Amino acid sequence: SMSKECDGKMLFNIKSLMLPLDSITEFGDECYAHLSEDETQKETLTEHTRRCQKYWFNIVEAKHIETVFIKFEQLYMGDITNEARHIFELMSVNVVTLHDIGKINPLFQKLKMKNSWKVEYVPESISSRHSIVSAIFYLDYFLDIINTAKGDGRINRDESDVLKDFAYIYSYIISRHHSDMNNLEYFFSGLTGKNTEGDNSGKDAYDWYEMFKQELYKEPVVKLRKRDEWLNRMAYQSNEKNIYLYAWTRLLYSLLVAADYYATSEFMNGYENNDYGNVNNIDNIINEYENNDVQKS
C-alpha cells in the first residue's frame, strides 16, 4: 500500500527505513534474546530483531498505520527539511530495531541466557536489566546522527532540538517496553541522576555503556541534555500539540509491544501468527504481555 498520497507526497517506504541490526552492533549473533522453555533452544538477538521488524511492519500494513504516520508528521513537525524528516522517520521506525539491543549486557547474557559472554564487562550497578540499556544505546545512536547532521548544516538548530525531543521520548518507550508507561519526567530525572525517588538506573546504565563503548571502540557516548532544559521544552508546547504527541507515543509503544509479543511467541511456539485481528484491541495484548512470564526475563 505504498501508493501516492492525494497531496502528491510519496508515502515513505517504511521497509527501506528499517536498519539491519548488524549495521548497529556486531554482537547480534553472539548474544541471545530468548531461551526456549526447556533451555535447549536459543534465539539470537539478530533473529529476534528480524522477527520483531517483520511483525511491526505487518501490523503497520494490516492496520494502514502509515496514514497515521503521515498525518502526525504533518500536524506535529510542520514544514521541515527532507533531511530532518528522514531522521525523524528513521528514528520512529527503528524503535523496534533497537528495543532489545541492551541484551548485550553481559550479566543479562550470563544470568538469563546462560551465555558466558564478555564477562570482563559485567556491570556493577544495573544487574541483568536490559530495557534501560537499550534506551541508552538508542539515545547514543540517534543523538549522534542528529548532532552530525546539525554539524554538517543539513538540519538547523530548531530541527535538531525537536528531533532530540523524539530521541528522548523514543528511548523512554524502549525503557518501558516491559512495564507500564509511567512518567516521562521520572525517566528523564533518572537519566540525569536527579531522580527524587532514588531510581537512577538510567544514569547507571549510561555510565556502564560509556565504559563498554570506550573499552571496545575508544569512542565517547553523546552527552545528554540537562533535566531542566528538557522539562522547559516540554512545558512550552500547546495542549493540542501535546495531545498529538501523547497519542503518537501510545501508538508507537503499542506497536512495539505487539510486535515483540508476536515475535517472542513465534520463537517459543515455533510458528508464525499472521492474524492481526486482535491488534484492534491492542490493550489486551499489552495486558497479556505484561502478565506473561516469558517477557519478564
Language model segments and positions:
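Accessory nucleic-acid engagement/destabilization modules that flank
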Residues: 2-7, 13-295
